[in-house]
Amino acid sequence: MSKPTREEAKEAVRTLLKFIGEDPNREGLLKTPDRVINSYTEIFSGYGKDAQEILNTKFYDICNFQDLISLEGIKFTSFCEHHILPFNGTVHIAYIPDNCIIGVSKLARIVNIFARRLQIQEKMTLEIAESVQENLKPLGVAVKISALHSCMSMRGVMHDNSVMNTMYYTGIFAEQQKYRYEFLNLIAKR
């Protein structure tokens, strides 16, 4: 599949404006196609980034630390691949290192990469956990995402405050309940 030109993308926005009954030539909408393309370039910038590159900087043998490390409350906005409507929420990530750790900002950057793609929450949860697991090789990874979905509040069932939760565990978190409980108890205190 070849990528459309910027002009082709702008024409597609004009077509959508006509489809909803608007005049793309009226004053308030003249620059809308350009603005939409600029917004989409930023919003969907995760396609041009590789999680592995973010996780390449590792620290080995840092005080032999082998207990739970977590980053909680990572805010994100992503877009549902079914309706191209936003869903936003919070990600909590924990891992138990084996022989290396990463800088704390790297976990937030991983969330940004996957959130800035057309996405479903379940897949995003899995992608975050698996990218940390594959690149760090920790004893285990735990990820929980809680999000509000505009596709439920703006259309369809019209439920405003329904929160969807997804969790994914690898390694020791998947194998031993006590580690899952430790993670869930930690994030419950937020």
From Swiss-Prot:
Keywords, A to Z? GTP-binding, Hydrolase, Metal-binding, Nucleotide-binding, One-carbon metabolism, Zinc
Pathways involved: Cofactor biosynthesis; 7,8-dihydroneopterin triphosphate biosynthesis; 7,8-dihydroneopterin triphosphate from GTP: step 1/1
Q: Which reaction does it catalyse?
A: GTP + H2O = 7,8-dihydroneopterin 3'-triphosphate + formate + H(+)
Residues engaged in binding Zn(2+): C80, H83, C151
Transmembrane parts of this sequence: none
* Protein's name according to its UniProt entry: GTP cyclohydrolase 1
Under the subunit heading, UniProt states: Toroid-shaped homodecamer, composed of two pentamers of five dimers.
According to its UniProt entry, this protein's organism is: Rickettsia prowazekii (strain Madrid E)
Name one cellular component (GO) term: cytoplasm
Q: Does the keyword Nuclease apply?
A: no
The record ties this protein, via NCBIfam families, to: folE, PRK09347.1-2, PRK09347.1-3
Task: Identify the enzyme class.
Answer: hydrolase
Q: Does the keyword Cell membrane apply?
A: no
Q: Which InterPro entries match?
A: GTP-CH-I_C/QueF (IPR043133), GTP-CH-I_N (IPR043134), GTP_CycHdrlase_I (IPR001474), GTP_CycHdrlase_I_CS (IPR018234), GTP_CycHdrlase_I_dom (IPR020602)
User: Could you cite one Gene Ontology molecular function of this protein?
Assistant: GTP cyclohydrolase I activity
E.C. number? 3.5.4.16
**Biological-process GO terms, alphabetical:** one-carbon metabolic process; tetrahydrobiopterin biosynthetic process; tetrahydrofolate biosynthetic process
Q: Could you tell me which Pfam families the record lists for this protein?
A: GTP_cyclohydroI
State the family it belongs to: Belongs to the GTP cyclohydrolase I family.
